[in-house]
Amino acid sequence: RPFLSKEFPEAAMVSEWGEPDKSLQAGFDMDFLLHFGPSHYNDLFRCEEPYFSSRGKGSAAAFVEKYKESRKKAGETGLICIPSGNHDMDRLARTLHGDELKVAFAFLLTMPGAPFIYYGDEIGLRYVENLVSVEGGYNRTGSRSPMQWNHSVNFGFSNASPEKLYIPTDDKPNSPTVEDQMADPASLYYEVKKLIALRRVHSALLSDGDIEFVSDGADGAPLAYIRSSADEKILVIINPADKEAVLEVPGIWNESLYTVGGTVKAENGKRIISPKSANVLR
């Protein structure tokens, strides 16, 4: 790392350990959480009852506890990153759908660390079921299908004969494309763009901003945290469940910077949080 920092100061080393409290101390600039190991990352998106499912039966508490522990151990040596997915995981859209994906991205793009968006997750690209394994992909093969740009041959990915593609496209009805989502202001694609723009203009939401959890999302409860920098403090409240929630939050947060799925109302010193919503307040 000293050599890289000296010779290529704008480069960064990213590990694939999934244990940032170890990898950052070993010299990497950043590490991203994985679907195995001690992080409880799967509790959020990829388990029988993920926290971001609108059924509201999941819990983020174990993830939050381990995340705080990892940040404490890592100190300021590097970034702990939370990816939307990668080539070894089930697609995010295999377990989450519609508004659930929008709320999940609100979390991913307001947390510390460098955002990692696996290609296609920003349009809800689906896991392609029942594919023959390609070069040792096995059940991971369905997460490696081509990007889908439009409705031309092979969804705009290639003009080759479909049978010559390395992995087939998702040919089922309502298969998402970039073209369709760019034409729809209510699409997941546009929501992700809004969140990226929000992150870029608020120092508290940048990769190295601090975080303090107000609610750990235990047993389907809202997940709430305060992001802060030297210039500002921002409150993020996330309620993936399909029912209204009530939360006590310290401080005065009157300015809405972002909302999806419904707003947060102040009432008798508490916050009334809309179902399937994410809100960013200042």
Predicted regions and their residues:
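The catalytic "switch" region of P-loop NTPases
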Residues: 34-42
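Glycoside hydrolase catalytic-domain groove-lining segments
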Residues: 53-77
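Beta-strand-rich binding/interaction modules
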Residues: 244-262
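Generic detection of short hydrophobic beta-strand segments and adjacent strand-loop junctions
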Residues: 147, 245-249, 271-273
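Loop/helix patches that line or flank the sugar-binding groove of alpha-linked glycan CAZymes
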Residues: 4-12, 18-19, 23-27, 31-35, ...
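C-terminal beta-strand-rich structural cap/linker in extracellular carbohydrate-active enzymes
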Residues: 265-282
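A conserved amphipathic helix/loop scaffold
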Residues: 237-238, 264
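Extracellular glycoside hydrolase catalytic/binding regions
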Residues: 43-48
